[in-house]
């Protein structure tokens, strides 16, 4: 499973993993055995701990009653919650590698492609290559500009800002792109201050394989474990000390291997009734 596969990466940062579930101990033992889980899985059949963390899923009914909203807490050695990562919809969840990237932005993500374009170098990476429906994945575009060259940040007036535009396939949804804080550049020639990026900077955008939005075609695609492409473009206008070059666009592409959900249940004798 995703969390087990990321266990070593967390431990290299000095973090230990534990999971908690409303399932009884026999169910968790069966699950851990089938998936070779090597971190503690804690049974909370009355959802007392789940309620204490205020993550009880109010929409869960029947045999799922008592279930927690899926997500992550980063808790320090004193028991203080330092960070938490939960999606608005209980069907969606961040992947473990996604959370590592949010906790430790300096960690290298898996590089997808490197593109040499007019006045910039673009490196594409992603938090995960293999996901299941409901996963939230971070796509990253690292931009490297030559010396004395800048591009304009979103929000600039009168110039073409840098903009990452994604065309997500059916069944996927994207959140707004996240840009770094710009620096303010004073343009002596026109006596004007403008927000810009120079040197190297990173743009991030999360995409979600949304279970609730899967149509018949997308559901069939994702259920077979095929590769899904996310394409788009990086639009920008590069300028140096004397010239603003014509607006340009670079195509971008990431690929995800979407595996079907594991719907196998524990033996009937220990299942939720």
Which sequence ranges carry the predicted segments?
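Extracellular/lumen-exposed scaffold segments
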Residues: 100-273
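Solvent-exposed coil/turn segments that connect beta secondary-structure elements
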Residues: 23, 45-47, 78, 169, ...
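Structural microenvironment flanking redox-active thiols in thiol-disulfide oxidoreductases
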Residues: 1-40, 45-48
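Structural micro-motif
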Residues: 36-40, 55-61, 65-73
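Short, charged, surface-exposed secondary-structure boundary motifs
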Residues: 49-54
């Amino acid at each position: 499973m995703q969390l087990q596969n990321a266990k070593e990466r967390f431990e290299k940062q000095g973090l230990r993993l534990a999971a908690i579930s409303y399932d009884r101990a026999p169910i968790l033992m069966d699950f851990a055995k089938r998936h070779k889980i090597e971190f503690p899985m804690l049974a909370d059949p009355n959802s007392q701990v789940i309620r204490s963390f205020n993550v009880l899923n109010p929409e869960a009914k029947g045999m799922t009653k008592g279930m927690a909203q899926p997500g992550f807490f980063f808790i320090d050695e004193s028991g203080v919650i330092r960070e938490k990562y939960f999606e608005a919809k209980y069907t969606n969840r961040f992947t473990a590698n996604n959370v590592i990237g949010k906790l430790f932005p300096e960690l290298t993500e898996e590089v997808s492609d490197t593109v040499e374009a007019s006045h910039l170098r673009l490196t594409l990476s992603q938090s995960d290559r293999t996901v299941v429906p409901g996963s939230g994945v971070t796509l990253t575009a690292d931009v490297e500009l030559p010396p004395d060259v800048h591009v304009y940040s979103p929000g600039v007036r009168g110039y073409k800002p840098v903009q990452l535009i994604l065309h997500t396939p059916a069944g996927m949804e994207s959140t707004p792109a996240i840009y770094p804080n710009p620096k303010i550049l004073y343009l002596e020639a026109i006596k004007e201050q403008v927000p810009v990026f120079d040197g190297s900077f990173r743009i991030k955008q999360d995409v979600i394989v949304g279970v609730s939005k899967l149509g018949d075609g997308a559901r069939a695609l994702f259920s077979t474990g095929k590769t899904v492409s996310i394409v788009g473009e990086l639009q920008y206008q590069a300028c140096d000390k004397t010239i603003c070059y014509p607006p340009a666009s670079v195509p971008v592409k990431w690929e995800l291997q979407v595996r079907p959900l594991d719907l196998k249940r524990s033996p009937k004798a220990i299942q939720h009734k």
